[in-house]
């Protein structure tokens, strides 16, 4: 482990000592986990001010709805080749605590260090996080993308609209319960002179490769 990296870790840990934050160094990267999502804005503001993290390079999220589950029935063999058949999972869209995690990537050019700050979100039905677009302008579009893809809302965001999907799009494509085929497909209708939407005609199927471990 780099001595400089350890030094940065200890200094940042001291700055955040008054908050519910856990930190670690893994694979040469510093990561801090915030326990309470209500503290996100305050902690990030403190990091920017006191350790000069002047750049927010990315905001993203992870959906852990199917974490640890498999699309393959490995318990029993149903074919002569030794492979089980892929199956479609039935997802329950009810609230699941800690289903979503939000991740911030920060850069301090003054201290020449990058860190990752993440937080598990407690309520999966009303997912609300304070926007940090007032701290870093780069968060504006990044938070819009997270909202568009995952359905996470950002309180006090100046313009929280979809940024990648079409107007009137239903659902959030990077959620694990969103079908891979989507709900509708679009094509240009020459008779109508416009784009029309139609239900998808593609059958949803498992396309996760079967991994065999010795």
Curated annotation (Swiss-Prot):
It is a peripheral membrane protein. It catalyses: a quinone + NADH + 5 H(+)(in) = a quinol + NAD(+) + 4 H(+)(out). Its main location: membrane. InterPro entries: NADH_DH_suC, NADH_quin_OxRdtase_su_C/D-like, NADH_UbQ_OxRdtase_30kDa_su, NADH_UbQ_OxRdtase_CS. It comes from the Bacteria. Its EC number is 7.1.1.-. PROSITE patterns: COMPLEX1_30K. Keywords: Cell inner membrane, Cell membrane, Membrane, NAD, Quinone, Translocase, Transport, Ubiquinone. It is an enzyme of class 7 (translocase). The keyword Cell inner membrane applies. One of its GO terms (cellular component) is plasma membrane. GO terms for molecular function: NADH dehydrogenase (ubiquinone) activity; NADH:ubiquinone reductase (non-electrogenic) activity; quinone binding. Gene3D superfamilies: NADH:ubiquinone oxidoreductase, 30kDa subunit. The keyword Protein biosynthesis does not apply. Belongs to the complex I 30 kDa subunit family. PANTHER family: NADH DEHYDROGENASE [UBIQUINONE] IRON-SULFUR PROTEIN 3, MITOCHONDRIAL, NADH DEHYDROGENASE UBIQUINONE IRON-SULFUR PROTEIN 3. NDH-1 is composed of 14 different subunits. Subunits NuoB, C, D, E, F, and G constitute the peripheral sector of the complex. This is NADH-quinone oxidoreductase subunit C. The lineage of its organism: Bacteria, Pseudomonadati, Pseudomonadota, Gammaproteobacteria, Thiotrichales.
